[in-house]
Amino acid sequence: MFFSLLLMLGLTEAEKIKICLQKQVNSSFSLHNGFGGNLYATEEKRMFELVKPKAGASVLNQSTWIGFGDSRTDKSNSAFPRSADVSAKTADKFRSLSGGSLMLSMFGPPGKVDYLYQGCGKHKVFYEGVNWSPHAAINCYRKNWTDIKLNFQKNIYELASQSHCMSLVNALDKTIPLQATAGVAKNCNNSFLKNPALYTQEVNPSVEKCGKENLAFFTLPTQFGTYECKLHLVASCYFIYDSKEVYNKRGCDNYFQVIYDSSGKVVGGLDNRVSPYTGNSGDTPTMQCDMLQLKPGRYSVRSSPRFLLMPERSYCFDMKEKGPVTAVQSIWGKGRESDHAVDQACLSTPGCMLIQKQKPYIGEADDHHGDQEMRELLSGLDYEARCISQSGWVNETSPFTEEYLLPPKFGRCPLAAKEESIPKIPDGLLIPTSGTDTTVTKPKSRIFGIDDLIIGLLFVAIVEAGIGGYLLGSRKVSGGGVTKESAEKGFEKIGNDIQILRSSTNIAIEKLNDRISHDEQAIRDLTLEIENARSEALLGELGIIRALLVGNISIGLQESLWELASEITNRAGDLAVEVSPGCWVIDNNICDQSCQNFIFKFNETAPVPTIPPLDTKIDLQSDPFYWGSSLGLAITAAISLAALVISGIAICRTK
């Protein structure tokens, strides 16, 4: 800390002069009012700057997230890293296989990659899905699977957001009726899906032309390997016939395929005995698959004769922990047809954050692998953020952002505020001024400027760590003014209040994220109102903090002035008499200029003939006059005598 003092001298008798500490403030200073004390400062700055979110994905904790991907996150791909949209570090966090997707592993169409997706993490990032798209041309009793994919991805994101672990269960225990055998279909490239499996029944047209009703059973486990299963995602598949005649060419009954739970309750399927046919004119059935969320247990499947579609796989979730879900848009480059099922599924799932490109996919390794824009959007996965949201991620500590961050959002997210509404605090050169504080009745040292200020402003200081250092609890040990400890004690409660405020804000927003309502806009409007109220409350608290901060530093600096005045009085001994706070009378005949330099300029090299017992060089480190308040002048190795400067001396003699 540096000091700049202006000493003003006035003559009281022919041989005596009066020296006082004098204010040194001009129009370049601004006044800052505080609780218990005010400050003049040469500079000011906002307590916090507005932060801008970075577009793309990030995570709150590197140790608690997991990714599920394909070739664009597959480190084992022969073209890695040119084929990847993530760094090698991030690729290690993904469960990936080139050519794979969650839906391919669920249904297992012939000739496609079948990968066992499983893993645990509070935050799950999904960058997959493109391998089951129109370009894949999967044709098995339907050509367009986009609506099924949309429903599948939506259920995956929903269950993943409520679970710590998830796993594909690729082999369910089952019991198949004796008359049914595993079959293939011409409409499925003379093969069939692994899930559901197709079982057919040979029928003797002359004796039993309609066949027997199929009754089968499957069991959803409570555990698959090391993975606990509290809920399963099951595909309930069945055929849709346009008319009874299309199905019943032999004059038999209506088509049905129904799943029952252990109590006999229908949980999925289609029953044309009670539901009408489509009425269309097609002569080939279409396969439909609904997504069911089922608890572990034994389920039965009943179907009309000849065909049985049997669930063989599921995705299992432990439902132990809620957490963020990030879905990354998964599309092809030029020349390949994509769908937008991932985008639509995420946007319709509470708690899911969607990462979307603004430009077409342009790969580096080939047209479909290694897009620079996607690499930038996913580069945040290498870091930890304080806040993740649909608007992007933030790792700065400021509690405010210019624009409202769109939900869902997680972590310590900044609130929207206008720049001009953020309180300003003093910075640069600081000078305490007078103030009254009835709560300070017995300060541990006499404080100039509280009720008995001398001639006005006394003291100029440069806060080494910047004034923000006091608020954030970080400053150097050296320097004057308030200490880190006193600032922390003074603001501890308010600091805790702010954290509680932030936490309660995030909890409220996360609860709203979890709500499902037919009026989504009403929920968003309510969320915005809550955040605006929180922002105003936080700005109000910061105003209080600013006033306390100014007062705290002002008082601390004034205590430092008392230390300075005490040192001057002690150095002067009987040569100077303190006639009022900050003013001394000296006999000019007894204490000459070198003597005055020693007393008031702290001149360590000047001879002091009038005080022979003292050394001519002073080491303030060992000077007993500086033993005292830790809030006083912190004279340390970093602050030497050379840092003390008398900026001006005026001597006036009176008759």
UniProtKB/Swiss-Prot annotation:
Q: Which residues lie on this side of the membrane: Extracellular?
A: 15-630
Reaction(s) the record says it catalyses: N-acetyl-9-O-acetylneuraminate + H2O = N-acetylneuraminate + acetate + H(+); N-acetyl-4-O-acetylneuraminate + H2O = N-acetylneuraminate + acetate + H(+)
What segment(s) does the record annotate as region Esterase domain-2?
310-364
Where are the active-site residues found? S71 (nucleophile), D366 (charge relay system), H369 (charge relay system)
Keywords on record: Disulfide bond, Fusion of virus membrane with host endosomal membrane, Fusion of virus membrane with host membrane, Glycoprotein, Hemagglutinin, Host cell membrane, Host membrane, Host-virus interaction, Hydrolase, Membrane, Signal, Transmembrane, Transmembrane helix, Viral attachment to host cell, Viral envelope protein, Viral penetration into host cytoplasm, Virion, Virus endocytosis by host, Virus entry into host cell
Region (Esterase domain-1) residue spans: 41-158
Any S-S bridges, and between which cysteines?
C20-C583, C210-C252, C229-C316, C237-C289
Its subcellular locations are: Virion membrane; Host cell membrane
What membrane topology does the annotation report for this chain?
Single-pass type I membrane protein
Q: Which GO terms describe its molecular function?
A: host cell surface receptor binding; sialate 4-O-acetylesterase activity; sialate 9-O-acetylesterase activity
What does the entry report about post-translational modification of this chain? In natural infection, inactive HEF is matured into HEF1 and HEF2 outside the cell by one or more trypsin-like, arginine-specific endoprotease.
The residue range of the signal peptide is: 1-14
Per the UniProt entry, the glycosylated residues are N26, N61, N144, N189, N395, N552, N603
Cite the EC number.
3.1.1.53
Spell out the protein name for this chain: Hemagglutinin-esterase-fusion glycoprotein
- Origin species, per record, is Influenza C virus (strain C/Ann Arbor/1/1950)
> Gene of origin?
HE
